[in-house]
Every structure is written in structure tokens, then in C-alpha cells.
């Protein structure tokens, strides 16, 4: 496959434009607000409390959200090794990228039917949409070392995240215009735009713009002749085992992945629970009606701050990596994350203070994601087996996300508040920082 082909790179980065609407609109901005309101209010808008009975146990509504998200990620961890091994064996990872894209986008549309009275059933589209999003990224990320030379991978990765931030922000603004200007009132039955229409738009946007990517990405990266179809399903786990054995012989890569496992716990937990934290831990005033309107609009504004600052942040840290190197730049981002957690735990109680945190999160969010992806890509050996290597990366990422999200939810459930859970995130970032620091040395590492 030709590297640094402009048309190919443009098509690859455009998938970020297509699928980034899911983490923004569904997991960060509109759906968490929608879920929190629906599960704490009746049909007439009266507050009914945050406690929900599920399987005979009383849970805080935000903790159920965390646990369900972790369950969806667990399915991804179990499923993608099988499919990625098959994709590498067949040399047709584009087909799997399309499958997960369609699964995720159609599931987003299914969230239109979310209903508190059938909570378990309503969570199924959320689970399958999460599987679709993260599953597609395994195959999407594995194209990076094939389409871009090592010296261009930071720039290409950052361009993808920047496109994703811009595109998803554009759709969020469209949804906000619909919600604020044409909002449908379920009591008076007036208006045009139901909040749930946003979920339909996410699915249409994702599946529609992804067609540009699918049109230009090659169908096959290499050819294999299948001689033993019976071993295809176990091949994925064997491939992961082989990748692990190779990584054990590469101390730098092993140390980077260990560090990534821990600091990514904190990053992903923040992405998942940020809106719910702000809704429950920030002082929005004493009038419940005014507070509800204020918090919803303010949180959406904070998400937009994160998005647009994130565009600049991804390019800022890409530039910094060219000046001081990827590892030192990642260390800078981790230090900023630690400051964010300490500041949030001890200081953030008002909307203004939360806006400051939103700015800082936006600054480092895109940078840490883009640099993590490109740094891992640079550490990889020359091989055709990129999908299995990125599947291993994905498994490490998801295991960290599962543990981070569950630990956040468990501490919140046991202590009765989400603020105490921030302490666990600080620990994750510090461990990641300590493990990564030896990578700044130029001499060969032993780990």
C-alpha cells in the first residue's frame, strides 16, 4: 500500500469526522443529560429521586450508567480479538470496519426509543452502539502505519482527531439549535424537535459520512489463502498471544503500554462521567426548575469548549512532540491531567470553576489521544499484522476503561458522592507517569 497518499489520508481522517459524533453527542453531551433527566423525573417533569431499583438493588442512576458502559466495553474486549485475527488472516479489515460502523450508527438511532419503564431493554442500543464505535476503531487505527510514514504519523493522527472534534461539534450545534429553538414540549404537545431526534441525527451522520472513507480505503491489505477455516475463531486469541510474546521482547513498547493502561483509565473515566459529575456535584442554584435549565445549557456549552479547544490542543501537542519528542509531550499532558483532578476535587464547586476545568480538559484531551495512538504506531515492528497489534492496544485500552469506570462508580456508590471518586483517577495518572518516565532516556531499556 502506498504511504503518504493525500487522497488516502484524507479518506482515513474523515472517518474521525463521521464517528466522533458518538462520543460527543451520545456519551458526553446530550444522552447523559437526557438519561439523567429521564431517570430522575416523571412524565410531567416532577423530580422522583436519583435512586433506581435494578435486580432488587438500589443504585444511584449515574452509577448504573457507568456499569452499563463498562459492560459494553467488556463485550468489545472479548469480541474484537476474534474478529481482528480473522481480519488479518483474510486481509479484509475494511469489511469489519464497515460492520461495526453500521452496528454503531443504527444502534444510535435505536436510542430514540429509550424508556425508563423498560430500562434494561432501553440500554441494549446503547450497549451495541458502544460496541460498534470501539470495535470500528480497532480496524480504523490499524490503517495508520500502512497509510502514513513514521515521520508523518503524529500529524496524520492529530488531523484525524481535529476533524473529529470539528465535525462532531458541528452536529452538536445543529442538535442544540433544534432543542433550544424548536424544542417539543411533551406536556403541551407543541414544538417540533424532540431531544431524541438528536440520536437519529447521530446515526445518519455517522453512517453517511463514513461512505467517503469506505470508498477510498483499500478492501484488502494482503492476501491469504485459507487452509483451515476451523481455526479462524481461535486465531484471534492466538494472534494476541503472539503479539504479547513479541511485546515482551520490546521493553520500550511494553513500558509504554503499561503506562498507557493506567493513564488511559483516568482519561476515559473523565470522558464518560464528566457531565454526570457536573450535574450532581456543581452548585447550580436552589430553584430546581431554573437549575435544571441552567445546568443543561451550561454543560452543553462546556462540552463545546472542550471540543473547540481540543482542535487547537491536538495540533499544539503535535507541534510540541516534534520539538521535544512524543514521550516528553505525553508526560506534560499527564501532569496537566493530574492538576485537573486535584483542582476539581478541591476547588471546583461553581459553574465558572467548571468552565476552567472544561478548557483544560479540552486542551489535553485531543493531544493525549492522538499522541498515544501515533506513539504506539511508531513503536511497532515492521509487519503486515497491524490489526492484531492494534487489537492488543484496544484490549489494553478497554481493560483500563472498564476498571477505571467501574472503580469510579463503585467509590461513588459506596461513599454517596462522585467527588471522592476523583481520588482514584489521580492515582491512575500518577502510576502512568511513573511508568512512562524512564522512556525519556535514549539508552536501551530493561523492563
What are these regions (language model features)?
Residues 78-92, 312-326, 412:
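Helix-to-loop junctions at the C-terminal end of transmembrane segments
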Residues 9, 113, 205-216, 368, ...:
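Multi-pass alpha-helical transporter architecture, strongest
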Residues 157-179, 394-405:
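Glycine-rich segments within core transmembrane alpha-helices of 12-TM secondary carriers
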Residues 2-9, 218-258:
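Juxtamembrane intracellular "pre-TM" segments in multi-pass secondary transporters
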Residues 58-61, 179-204, 410-429:
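A membrane-interface helix-boundary motif in multi-pass transporters
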Residues 107, 118-136, 352-367:
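Hydrophobic core of transmembrane alpha-helices in multi-pass small-molecule transporters
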Residues 98-117, 335-349:
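C-terminal ends and interior cores of transmembrane alpha-helices
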Residues 26-61, 272-297:
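Short amphipathic helix-loop junctions that connect adjacent transmembrane helices
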Amino acid at each position: 500500500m502506498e504511504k503518504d497518499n493525500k487522497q488516502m489520508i484524507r479518506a482515513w481522517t474523515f472517518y474521525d469526522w463521521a464517528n466522533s459524533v458518538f462520543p460527543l453527542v451520545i456519551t458526553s453531551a446530550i444522552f447523559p443529560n437526557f438519561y439523567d433527566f429521564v431517570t430522575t423525573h416523571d412524565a410531567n417533569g416532577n423530580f422522583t429521586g436519583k435512586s433506581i431499583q435494578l435486580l432488587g438493588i438500589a443504585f444511584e442512576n449515574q452509577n448504573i450508567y457507568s456499569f452499563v458502559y463498562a459492560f459494553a466495553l467488556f463485550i468489545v474486549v472479548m469480541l474484537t480479538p476474534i474478529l481482528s485475527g480473522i481480519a488479518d488472516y483474510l486481509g479484509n479489515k475494511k469489511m469489519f470496519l464497515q460492520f461495526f460502523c453500521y452496528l454503531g450508527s443504527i444502534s444510535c438511532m435505536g436510542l430514540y426509543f429509550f424508556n425508563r419503564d423498560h430500562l434494561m431493554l432501553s440500554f441494549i442500543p446503547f450497549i451495541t452502539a458502544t460496541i460498534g464505535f470501539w470495535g470500528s476503531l480497532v480496524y480504523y487505527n490499524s490503517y495508520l502505519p500502512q497509510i502514513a510514514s513514521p515521520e508523518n504519523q503524529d500529524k496524520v493522527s492529530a488531523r484525524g482527531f481535529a476533524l473529529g472534534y470539528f465535525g462532531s461539534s458541528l452536529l452538536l450545534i445543529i442538535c442544540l439549535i433544534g432543542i433550544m429553538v424548536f424544542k417539543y414540549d411533551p406536556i403541551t404537545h407543541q414544538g417540533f424537535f424532540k431531544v431524541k431526534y438528536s440520536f437519529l441525527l447521530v446515526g445518519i451522520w455517522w453512517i453517511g459520512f463514513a461512505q467517503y472513507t469506505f470508498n477510498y480505503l483499500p478492501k484488502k491489505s494482503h492476501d491469504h489463502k485459507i487452509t483451515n477455516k476451523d481455526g479462524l475463531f481461535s486465531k484471534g486469541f492466538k494472534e494476541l498471544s503472539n503479539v504479547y510474546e513479541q511485546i515482551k521482547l520490546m521493553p520500550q513498547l511494553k513500558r509504554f503500554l503499561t503506562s498507557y493502561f493506567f493513564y488511559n483509565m483516568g482519561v476515559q473515566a473523565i470522558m464518560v462521567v464528566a457531565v454526570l459529575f457536573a450535574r450532581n456535584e456543581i452548585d447550580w442554584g436552589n430553584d430546581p426548575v431554573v437549575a435544571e435549565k441552567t445546568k443543561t445549557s451550561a454543560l452543553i456549552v462546556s462540552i463545546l469548549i472542550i471540543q473547540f479547544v481540543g482542535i487547537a490542543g491536538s495540533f499544539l501537542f503535535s507541534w510540541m512532540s516534534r520539538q521535544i519528542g512524543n514521550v516528553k509531550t505525553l508526560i506534560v499532558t499527564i501532569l496537566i491531567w493530574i492538576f485537573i483532578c486535584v483542582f476539581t476535587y478541591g476547588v471546583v464547586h461553581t459553574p465558572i470553576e467548571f468552565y476552567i476545568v472544561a478548557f483544560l480538559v479540552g486542551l489535553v484531551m485531543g493531544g493525549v489521544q492522538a499522541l498515544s495512538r501515533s506513539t504506539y504506531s511508531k513503536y511497532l515492528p515492521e509487519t503486515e499484522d497491524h490489526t492484531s497489534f492494534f487489537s492488543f492496544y484496544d484490549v489494553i485500552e478497554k481493560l483500563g476503561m472498564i476498571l477505571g469506570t467501574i472503580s469510579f462508580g463503585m467509590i461513588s456508590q459506596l461513599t454517596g458522592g462522585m467527588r471522592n471518586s476523583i481520588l482514584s483517577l489521580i492515582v491512575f495518572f500518577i502510576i502512568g507517569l511513573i511508568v512512562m518516565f524512564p522512556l525519556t532516556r535514549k539508552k536501551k531499556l530493561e523492563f
